[in-house]
A protein has these predicted regions:
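Transition-metal
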Residues: 1-170
């Protein structure tokens, strides 16, 4: 098992300062991290996304297993997770996602309601990105699973079209 250095994302909808679970988790991972009470902390990312890649941290035991030599001779905090997966694709099993993760693990700390989001399947995501890369930032589908770490309210799904029509006054 290896410790990961995570990436913070600050958005206006995040919780502020120490009230944010994201800030608390980042502080527990990195004792040098200073929580700014006036700053919002919205998301903590663990993955290979280029906007917030995780690092696999040195732990002093690099010479004791198959990771020996991966960090090279340079000093530093560690290597990017994507580099580890590119050099050791078997860590992902027999999946087709060699060198990358097929998911992004996030912890969210939400203070304000988020906008409605629509997540297309993989084929539609590829088509949308190919035709409108200005609107669709990548060709990935985005299936989601939520696990509540604290109290929250969430809405999921929509009424069927015919049922919506019953409430329309047009």
């Amino acid at each position: 098992m290896r410790r990961l250095e995570t990436a913070l994302q600050r958005y206006a909808w995040g919780k502020s300062g120490s009230d944010s679970m994201v800030a608390q988790l980042k502080k527990s991972e990195d004792s040098d991290f200073d929580v700014d009470e006036g700053q919002t902390y919205a998301e903590l990312w663990m993955g290979t996304h280029p906007n917030g890649p995780s690092r696999v941290m040195r732990d002093g035991h690099e010479g004791t297993d198959e990771l020996q030599g991966l960090y090279g001779s340079a000093e530093g905090p560690g290597m990017f997770l994507i580099e580890l997966l590119e050099t050791h694709p078997h860590y992902l099993g027999d999946q087709e996602h060699v060198g990358d993760l097929p998911f992004m693990f996030k912890v969210l700390s939400i203070n304000k309601a988020l906008s409605i989001q629509a997540h297309p399947d993989k084929k539609l995501a590829e088509r949308l990105y190919a035709t409108r890369p200005d609107l669709y930032k990548d060709d990935n589908h985005k299936p989601e699973m939520a696990v509540a770490l604290s109290d929250f309210e969430g809405l999921c799904g929509f009424r069927p079209f015919r049922e919506i029509g019953k409430y329309s006054t047009m």
